[in-house]
A protein has these predicted regions:
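Bacterial extracytoplasmic/cell-wall-associated proteins, especially those involved in peptidoglycan
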Residues: 1-128
Length: 128
């Protein structure tokens, strides 16, 4: 879990919220749908994807692609900073189940419901 957080978030606060989303999704038996795992799967661990992810990427049948599998990948996807592990062990609580990274404001946007997530994503894409 900590390797997913490490790749998904940069700030400590975002790491707390991303960790809570991952734990909430695991608790609710939802697919994690973490982009970093899909990038890891496509690039075989190189992480240098010179384009945006697309729908076909998300359907990639690989044990590391959390859009395809349910639960965690078989192994970590990167080395983890000690601080990230400490943040995960805080077991930060939220009601969030979804998030995306807003490039314009350089931060993650979190939501509790799929309906809210979809609406926020649509607004973001209109302003791109």
């Amino acid at each position: 879990i900590s390797s997913l957080i490490e790749k998904e978030a940069k700030s400590d606060q975002d790491k707390r919220l991303v960790s809570s989303v991952i734990l909430n999704r695991l608790d609710n038996n939802l697919k994690l749908q973490v982009d970093a795992t899909t990038i890891f799967s496509i690039t075989k661990g190189k992480y240098k994807l010179k384009r945006d992810l697309n729908y076909q990427d998300l359907k990639n049948k690989d044990e590391y692609n959390t859009y395809f599998i349910r639960g965690l990948p078989p192994l970590p996807i990167c080395y983890v900073n000690r601080k990230t592990i400490e943040i995960l062990l805080e077991n930060y609580k939220s009601e969030y189940l979804f998030y995306f990274f807003n490039e314009q404001v350089q931060k993650h946007i979190f939501s509790k419901t799929y309906k809210q997530h979809k609406k926020l994503l649509e607004e973001y894409r209109k302003n791109e």
